[in-house]
Design a protein with these regions (language model features):
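Predominantly soluble domains enriched in secretory-pathway, periplasmic, or organellar proteins
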Residues: 18-371
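Sec-dependent bacterial lipoprotein signal peptides
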Residues: 1-19
Length: 371
C-alpha cells in the first residue's frame, strides 16, 4: 500500500501589506499521482496567490507521489512508485520555474519497490527514499549535476511497515515511524539510525515506542532538540528530546507531559514554523489545522486559544500535508477527499489567515517550494 505523503503547509508571517516579504517569486510543485502529473505554480510574494504556469501540469512517472527540491534550487526529484516505474525522476529547474527532465530515471529495483517518500539532507549531498513495498530505505549520493548514485550497502532494511521519516537538521540522524501491531504492541514505534556518508546504522536500542497508534506525522525543531509525533489513531502528539544529557547520541527520550492529547481528531501531519515557536497540526478527522505554541525550555506544546475556544482553522477537505514557503510567509495545506486541492493561509504569530483554495483536478500527494 502506498502511504499518504505529507504535503505541505506554508507558514506565513506579516500578512498586512506583507511587510518584510521578499520580492522574489517562488515556484510551487505539486504531485498528482492519480493522473501521473506534476503541477507547477508561481507564488506571488506579496499575496501568496498561486498562478499555474502555462503548459503545465507535466505528465511524469507512474504514480508520481513525493517531490523534493535540492537546497540549491537547481534540481527537483520525484518518486514514481507505480508498478511500471519504481524509480526517481530528476529535473533541472529553469529560472522561470519550468522543468527539464534529465534521463534516464534512477531505479530503486530490484531490492526496492514502491518508492513513496523522499527526504534530503540539509546540505543536499544525499537523497533518502522510503520504499513502502519492500520496507527499506534506498540512499543515493548527489553529484554536481544532480545525478544519483546508490551508496554502498543500500537499501537499508527496516523490516517493519514504514509510515514516515525525518532527518535532524544536522543530517546526523534519521528517524522512521513504523506501524504498530508488529512487535507485540498496538502502539507504533520510532526506528532510529545514525548517518555517516549517507549510510545508515541502527541506533542502540533501535526502537522507541511512539506511545500512540499510527505515528504518521513527524517533525523536528530547527535546533534538533525535540521531535514531535502525530499519533493519528490515538488522537495524541508525542514529544521526544533528542540526545538528552547523559544518553548516547541520537537517543529519543519522551519528555514529561507527553503524549499530549490532541484537542481535535486524527492528527496526521505536523509543521513547525522556522523559529520553532509554533506547531501546526493537520487534523484529518475534524478537517482543520490547530495551532500550538512551543515552550522553548521543555519543548511542550500549548494550544493557542481565543477567549472561548482553541485556535483551529477550517480546511476545505481532509488535510494530509503541510509545508511552508522559504521565507516563512505563507502556509499551504494539501487537502484530500471530495474537496481535494491546495489551500493557502497567511501566518502572523501563529494566527492563520485564510487566503485562497486551488482546485488541482486530482488529489495532491505532496508539494515542494523552490528556494
Amino acid at each position: 500500500m502506498l502511504q499518504k505523503a505529507l504535503i505541505l503547509v506554508f507558514a506565513v508571517a506579516g500578512i498586512a501589506g506583507c511587510v518584510g516579504c521578499s520580492t522574489t517569486s517562488h515556484y510551487v510543485y505539486a504531485t498528482l499521482p492519480a493522473a501521473n502529473e506534476l503541477a507547477v505554480y508561481r507564488e506571488d510574494p506579496f499575496s501568496g496567490t498561486l498562478t499555474e504556469l502555462a503548459g503545465t501540469p507535466y505528465t511524469i512517472g507512474d504514480g508520481a507521489h513525493s517531490v523534493v527540491i535540492h537546497p540549491s534550487g537547481k534540481f527537483l526529484y520525484v518518486a514514481n512508485p507505480g508498478q511500471n516505474e519504481n524509480d526517481i525522476s530528476l529535473f533541472d529547474i529553469l529560472s522561470n520555474g519550468y522543468l527539464n527532465e534529465i534521463p534516464p530515471r534512477t531505479t530503486v529495483a530490484p531490492n526496492g519497490t514502491q518508492p513513496a517518500l523522499l527526504a534530503m539532507d540539509p546540505a543536499g549531498n544525499y537523497l533518502y527514499v522510503m520504499n513502502t513495498g519492500s520496507d527499506n530505505i534506498s540512499v543515493f549520493s548527489i553529484d554536481s549535476t544532480g545525478g544519483l548514485t546508490q551508496v554502498p550497502n543500500s537499501p537499508f532494511f527496516i523490516g517493519l511497515t514504514p509510515l514516515n521519516m525525518v532527518l535532524t537538521p544536522s543530517g546526523d540522524f534519521l528517524y522512521v515511524s513504523v506501524a504498530g501491531g508488529q512487535i507485540g504492541t498496538s502502539n507504533g514505534s520510532i526506528l532510529g539510525f545514525s548517518v555517516s556518508s549517507g549510510a545508515l546504522q541502527l541506533l542502540n536500542p533501535p526502537l522507541t515506542s511512539a506511545d500512540g497508534v499510527n505515528p504518521n506525522g513527524l517533525v523536528i525543531d530547527p535546533s534538533g532538540s525535540y521531535m514531535y509525533v502525530a499519533n493519528t489513531q490515538s488522537d495524541s502528539i508525542s514529544i521526544f528530546a533528542i540526545s538528552p544529557p547523559n544518553t548516547p547520541p541520537g537517543t529519543l527520550q519522551q519528555v514529561i507531559g507527553s503524549p499530549l492529547d490532541d484537542i481535535y481528531s486524527d492528527p496526521f501531519a505536523l509543521l513547525l514554523d522556522p523559529k520553532g515557536q509554533f506547531l501546526y497540526v493537520a487534523n484529518q478527522g475534524s478537517s482543520n489545522v490547530a495551532v500550538y505554541s512551543i515552550d522553548s525550555t521543555t519543548g511542550l506544546p500549548t494550544a493557542l486559544t481565543t477567549s472561548t475556544s482553541a485556535f483551529a482553522f477550517t480546511t476545505e477537505g481532509s488535510p494530509s500535508f503541510l509545508v511552508e514557503d522559504p521565507n516563512g510567509n505563507y502556509l499551504f495545506v494539501g487537502n484530500q477527499g471530495s474537496s481535494a486541492g491546495i489551500q493557502a493561509f497567511g501566518v502572523n504569530s501563529g494566527n492563520l489567515n485564510p487566503l485562497l483554495t486551488y482546485a488541482v483536478g486530482n488529489t495532491p500527494s505532496s508539494i515542494a517550494v523552490a528556494p
